[in-house]
Swiss-Prot record:
Lineage, top ranks: Bacteria, Bacillati, Actinomycetota, Actinomycetes, Mycobacteriales
Annotated protein name in UniProt: Uncharacterized protein Cgl2664/cg2949
Oligomer and partners: Has been detected in a cytochrome bc1-aa3 supercomplex; its deletion however leaves complex activity unaffected.
Keywords: Signal
Annotated organism of origin: Corynebacterium glutamicum (strain ATCC 13032 / DSM 20300 / JCM 1318 / BCRC 11384 / CCUG 27702 / LMG 3730 / NBRC 12168 / NCIMB 10025 / NRRL B-2784 / 534)
Signal sequence coordinates: 1-30
Length: 194
């Protein structure tokens, strides 16, 4: 008679229990962050161009960024859109950044389905005026108390419909392609490109 190895029931039960515990652990860990009610579910990443709306959303602000020039000049870049279904025009009354008043050049009331595009004057000079559409361009300027690139500051827009407060990233305008020479690491960076 040949000897056959016989597995004990204890070993099989232990393996089954181990597989069950592993599967239950994986399921429990995966379900921890699967729900919508998490600590970070309502946080918006601090990236260029944050957006928000007022109560009932007759006016939206998009692409909100505090721009700094290389000369230290500051302004707010944003687009305000009137999407009021009652065909009412709305007025931008004021903008503040971290409590500091922003100067707005002649902002006219925003008609239904029209936009107000604002930025530093040097950036607006690069934009071509559209031949169609309902867009007004407004220059903004702001006292720069020492904003740091990559920082986040609160921006409050006050419209005739109410206030919209949003956190905006502080950024530099995009450099023109091929104009700026960025030296990285001195001679080692130059030598690595040969």
């Amino acid at each position: 008679m040949e000897d056959e190895s016989v597995k004990s029931l204890n070993l099989a039960a232990r393996r089954g229990a181990l597989v069950t515990v592993a599967a239950a652990s994986a399921l429990a860990l995966a379900s921890c962050s699967a729900g919508q009610i998490t600590q970070t579910s309502s946080q918006v990443a601090a990236v260029d161009g944050n957006q928000a709306g007022s109560a009932n959303d007759p006016v939206l602000v998009r692409d909100v960024t505090v721009h700094l020039t290389t000369d230290g000049e500051a302004g707010v870049k944003f687009t305000a859109i009137n999407q009021d279904t009652s065909h009412t025009s709305h007025t931008l009354e004021s903008v503040t950044v971290d409590g500091e008043e922003v100067e707005l050049d002649d902002a006219e009331p925003i008609e239904r389905n029209c936009s107000l595009v604002a930025d530093i004057q040097s950036e607006l000079d690069l934009i071509e005026e559209p031949e169609v559409g309902c867009i007004q361009h407004v220059a903004t300027s702001l006292e720069n108390p020492g904003f740091a690139y990559g920082g986040v500051v609160p921006v409050e827009f006050v419209f005739d419909t109410g206030a919209i407060t949003i956190d905006a990233t502080v950024s530099a305008p995009v450099l023109e392609s091929g104009v700026e020479n960025r030296e990285v690491g001195g001679d080692t960076a130059e030598a690595s490109h040969h």
